[in-house]
Amino acid sequence: MTLLFPAAWTLTMECQGASATFEIAPPNRVEVVAETYESLPLWNPNGWCFTKGFRLFGVRAMECSVAYALEQGSLRVETSEGRTLVEGTDYQFDSVWASIGLLEGGAATSDTPLLLSYAYRQQRIDTVVRLPDGSLSLVQGASDTVLPVPPKIEQGTPIANIYVDGRTSALSDENVFPIEANLASRDDEKPAPATVPKAAERLPKTYQKLLSGESVTILAWGDSVTETTYITDPEDRWQMQFLRRLEKRFPKAKITLVSVGWGGRTTTAFLNEPSGSPHNYQEKVLDAKPDLVVSEFINDSGLFKDQAAFEAQYGRILRDFQERGIEWAILTPHYSRCDWMGLTSQKHCDDDPRPYVAYLREFAKTHPVLLADAAHRWGHLWREGIPHETLLVNNINHPNPQGLSFFADALMKEFE
C-alpha cells in the first residue's frame, strides 16, 4: 500500500493495482456557547490530570475527560452579568484535560454561576474499501467525542481505516491504519497447532475437572478492570465473557465464578489490607478456596522497580496458591493511552514497552502458571485497523466491552 498526501486533508492511496484520491473531512468541530456552570471548585495544583479542577461538560469521557479534544485558546469564562474572567487571576485551566478551577481572591467564588464558551473537536474513523470491481471507495464514519467506531460496510472489503482526532491538523501516515487481515496475530507469528491445550499442561487439575464435568470454582482477581463498575451491563465484564465461553467449551462442567476486584489498587494493596477488610487477600482470595485464580492487574505495571522485586511478590503469591492447591492463570494487561505507556504512536506498537509485561512473560516460562497474553492482541490492533485508544471508555485505561473481550480471547486460546 502506497500513501501520498498532496494536501492537508487529501489522501492518495495505491493498493494492489487500484488507485484513488480521497478528500478526508477534518475532525468535527463543536462550538459551545454560554454553557452554565452553577459552581466551580477552587483550583487544585496538586491534582492529577483532570482532577485539578472541574471537567468541561463537552469533552467528558467516563469518569475522566478526553485529552487534547479542546481547541486551544477557545475557552471564554463570563459571569451572568457579562464580566469576562481572566485566566491566572480569576481561574486556572488545564487546556489538555479541559479542567478548570477558581483562584482565591478572584472575581468569582464557588457559588458564582458562570457561563463558559469553548470549542472542541471529535474523533472519527473512516474506512477505505475495495469494491467488487476492484476500485477503492471511502466510507465516512460517525463523529464521537470518546469512542469512535468504524462505519458499517455494506459492500466491499475494508482495507484501511483513517483515524482523526483533536490533534489532527493535517493527514499523515499516522492517521492511516491498514487492515492487514481479520486475524488476531500475524501469520509469521502463528504457533504450530497444539495437540494438547496449554491449559491442560499448566492448569492440569482445573482442566481435568472441566473435562470430567465436575464442579470448578474460578476466582477473577484484579483492579478496576476486574471490578468493572464502569460497565453498564455486568455481563460484558471480561470474566463473564470468559465464563460463557468456557461453559460452551465444557458444557458438562459446573462452574462457579467469584469476582474480587478493587479499583485503583495493586496486588500490594490487597496483600497489605487488614483482616476484616472487604479486600483482604487472605480472606477474600485464599480463603475462598478456588480451583483457579485468574488475575488481571494493569495497576501493577508501575509497581516494581526491577524484576527481582516482581519475582519476590509474584513468587510469594504463587507459593500461597500452591500450598492450598490453587492454580493460577495470569493475564497480561491491556494497553492504556500511549503517553502512559511510553509509546509515541498507536501504530507500530507490537512490542509492549512495559517492564511488567516482560516480567510476566518470563515468570510464566519458569513457573507453573498459565499466561494468557492479552497484551499481545492489544499490540496487534493497529494491524487490524483499530487505534487502541478508541477502545478506552475513560480515554485512559478502562476498556470497553470489545476491549474486555480480548481477555476472554486470550484465556480461551489456551483452553481450546
Where would I find each of the regions flagged by the language model?
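Extended beta-strand solenoid/passenger and fiber regions
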Residues: 1-99, 103-104, 121-134
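Extended acidic/polar, glycine-enriched regions
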Residues: 116-126, 131-133, 140, 144-149, ...
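Polybasic, proline/glycine-rich intrinsically disordered low-complexity segments
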Residues: 142-201
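Serine-esterase "nucleophile elbow" of acetyl-processing enzymes
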Residues: 194-261, 280-289, 293
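Catalytic His-Asp segment of secreted/periplasmic serine-dependent ester chemistry enzymes
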Residues: 199, 334-416
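Internal alpha/beta domain cores that form substrate/cofactor-binding pockets in large enzymes
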Residues: 219, 251-288, 293-295, 300-333
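Solvent-exposed loop/turn segments at secondary-structure junctions
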Residues: 224-227, 262-268, 298-304, 334-338, ...
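Second-shell loop/turn segments in exported
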Residues: 225-233, 300-307, 346-350, 392-397
